[in-house]
Amino acid sequence: MKISLSVDELERLICRVEDGAARVMVTASDADAAVHLIAAIDDAAQEGAGECFWEEGGGEYRWMLRRDGDKLRVVVLWCSGTLTGWETVLWRECDFETFRQQVQCEVARLQPVS
């Protein structure tokens, strides 16, 4: 699974996930949402599970991470309102350390150098 993060001209965080033929884009209206994903990864490392929410204008994404040894299950759900419920956007398993390192590198790349 390949993860890439960028910030668009409206200061929205864009996360692109590619895994084989699957290509998914997850967005957040606040570019600082990346730190919540890092915290969820840290929780998964320490407690076996972590989650965070990325808010968008039309709803919110929910990242759920479950660690089992060196494997990580990554689930991303989308909800546009209480009547529609949660829709699965992504459900994949990958190597935990590879995922953590990719996200950390992408977040560091987004940070301005001062």
Where in this protein do the model-derived segments appear?
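Short, low-complexity, polar/charged sequence segments that are solvent-exposed and flexible
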Residues: 24, 33-35, 44-45, 72, ...
